[in-house]
Amino acid sequence: MKKRDDVNKILIIGSGPIIIGQACEFDYSGTQACKALKKLGYEIVLVNSNPATIMTDPTTADVTYIEPLNADRITQIIEKERPDGLLPNLGGQTGLNLCAELYRKGVLDKYGVKVIGVQVDAIERGEDRIEFKNLMNSLGIEMARSEVAYSVDEALEIADRLGYPVVLRPAYTMGGAGGGLVYNVEELKTVCERGLQASLVGQVLVEESVLGWEELELEVVRDSTGKMITVCFIENIDPLGVHTGDSFCSAPMLTIPEDVQEELQRQAYRIVDAIEVIGGTNVQFARNTDDGRIIVIEINPRTSRSSALASKATGFPIALVSAMLAAGLDLCDIPCGKYGTLDKYIPDGDYVVIKFARWAFEKFKGSQDKLGTQMRAVGEVMSIGKTYKEAFQKAIRSLEIGRYGLGGAKNYAELPLKELLNMLHTPSSERQFIMYEAIRKGADIDELYDITKIKPYFLKEMKELVEEEEELKKYNGSVPPTDVLEKAKKDGFADKYLSQLLGVPEEDIRHARIEAGIVEAWEGVHVSGTQDSAYYYSSYNMKDESVASDKRKIMILGGGPNRIGQGIEFDYCCVHAAMALKKLGFETIIVNCNPETVSTDYDTSDKLYFEPLTLEDVLSIHEKEKPLGVIAQFGGQTPLNLAADLKKNGVNILGTTPETIDMAEDRDLFRAMMDKLGIPMPESGMAVTVDDALAIAKKIGYPLMVRPSYVLGGRGMEVVHDDEHMRVYMAAAVGVTPDRPILIDRFLNNALECEADAISDGENVFVPAVMEHIELAGIHSGDSACVLPSKNISDKNVEIIKDYTRRIAKEMNVKGLMNMQYAIENDTVYVLEANPRASRTVPLVSKVCNIGMVPLATQIITMPITGNPSPVPELKEKKFNHCGVKEAVLPFNMFQEVDPLLGPEMRSTGEVLGMASDFGEAFFKAEEATQTALPLEGTVLISVNDRDKSELIEVAEGFHECGFNIIATGGTCDMINGAGIPATKIFKLQQGRPNV
């Protein structure tokens, strides 16, 4: 069948900011869809509110809108652009919900917009709990016993009938938002109320608990003729009860019999056919291992987190193919390597893929490390190996949590077996590590299965690793014999982990291993729907058959798993670097292990290595490919932490040197440089012990900002107000050494914070704009809203900031990107820190200032190889007629037990951008894009300190004119009334009633 000609202009709705449950996999799917549809000759209109995405780049679609994702804004875009098609199933839950809302409001009919890929009634059949249940009943496919509730009272009645525990699932949500497993009446009341609010239609499904059953997923693709293929079978290793986004899983299924897989496929095909999705669908099943009963849990009639994983696990680009099918092509029209065409595809890889989630409980004080039906993970890694053991151990070292194997985590080795078994009763992010120590202490496989419901196959594999580790320890203090070392490497033991186990330097193990000929081999995963594209994984269990070209090559190190402080912004930088290198005539190599990203898409680089970002893995790729150099400054802290060791091993680090990066982190060296340049910094000191810290505090005076060195996202940062607080902080600080001391700075209490990104060639430096933080000093820059260009910084101070930035970049010989953080107190500009690397604001500055920050930096970084002149002298400052406001998106809805106060430790998962011709509208749009509706009526509480009272009247007058009632405290109220503005006085808590 040929492509559709009844649509010419297609609107694609993005998924908005990165939140728990909806991350950069939708940037990956949206970018792929744009590529596919443009290639087929369609005009693309794209709308998304997230500036850190590749899909919102001006070159991805024909017309791009960075606007809030709600029905009103999209209606305005439809009215202006007049698309005749809408593709809703690539923008996650956000895209589907908006499509359904636009349909219900009659907008799509009014403007003649056809929905392609998935019909609106199909969305309702898949997403509406009642519709889905009725459809399953008509097909004779079993579901968990359940009933729908529209109120808490109804839910209580249903739970009584079904028996506790029950699962609550709100309709039209994702990431398990608002839902959960409840064991009693009180829990049900709390969770149900939350669920009814979270649901788009005020509907919650109350379902019998299938806790402990197997959770199995299929990714199915269907075309308009009804032809279906299964892309991937995914086995969740954690049982039901843990959200699939938090669950540890494998592809292919490792313990599920062939006949059961066939039955799952038969049922999945009947469901997908009945819902009539064109493109990818994720179908989730539960199976009771006692009696073999299979039930369907739910489907996602769209690309999802699982489809991104399935795509990367199999080499089948689901989003790309889904877009082509939505445009009218059929599976038999799309060529596919060895199968001929896609309709003949079967998943037949001879390797094992493991997905492991990355959590951020340490960022949320008071959060419970407990996994349930509500997703808590902020990122994930994927690893590929020839065996389960190899892939599993690769996944652990990919996580970047300071662990290179399963043993030695926290203090688990010191705990008695009974305590470890107790800890396993509640699933947590530490579950695999606790099990490992429990097995070491003699836990029985059957007992572990009864507690965790993790199948004996996986527990036995873990037991074999424990036994092998105990065997290895016999060689303590030396490199083991070749046969023992070879077996350890085949089972996935990392060089670094062996070094920790044996007390031998990692270097010695690496040299002995290479000398004995124990080296990684590489194999390609073919990409379906392409002629000869592939990406590569390593294994010690095969012969090397991959071929490295002799072209001029440059390697980019990616950012690894998403986490708070290091997310999609750094992937954006890596992708742009790859594009720029291709234009400069280099073959590009990317190393990364994050399945959600555009950087791990098969055609972003010339060669993709899906590998952990560790010294061992990067060095072996370097040895294989022999690139001219490696770029470490675009992937956040991950590659920077490797840079010095790579350089020691003869790797040419391009751009800013590891020594410069270390100097920026070393407070003494950096302060000496600022003194030399005559640039003010807040007084500071470095402490290794409590006594050091108290002595510094006495000298500088409280409040103080304290933090560890070498961290990203403000990990471990706090504002300390007294000696007692300082003692508590120092006692809790982990891994503090003279090399890595605690940094202590005077906290600039009433300062305005701002930052500047710069492009430098070591001599010439360009600063596109200064960003002003809207939140007060002390809130991490990643959590603060910011405005670009600045609004309240005097021209004089903007010039000072640009001058300081230029002088510092030149002095440090920065080659590439740099980010500078400043604070202005009493009209003095203080330098807070310098980051000689890409920062999370690079996509924001690139978009608002319309400047290709990363391509320019890439040109500079490669100048020694290309001999090209620097682009920096040609860059000119531009005047803006518009204003951009970035607002942070925070995940407190997923951490109900945490106090939602912001501080110097970053907690946001994503961001949105509001753009307009003036600050007010841009700020309004940014707030609107975070799904926080700004109130247009009601009562405003005003209470300000004396210093700010002079600016108060104008603000109060504005609120009064807008029709708001004003209540105010003491002196503030008198001042407002004195200006002729009505206000009601209210007391502070300690002053009496009525109070705040």
Language-model-detected regions and their locations in the chain:
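Acidic/histidine-enriched active-site and ligand-binding environments that engage anionic O-linkages
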Residues: E157-V167, A695-M705
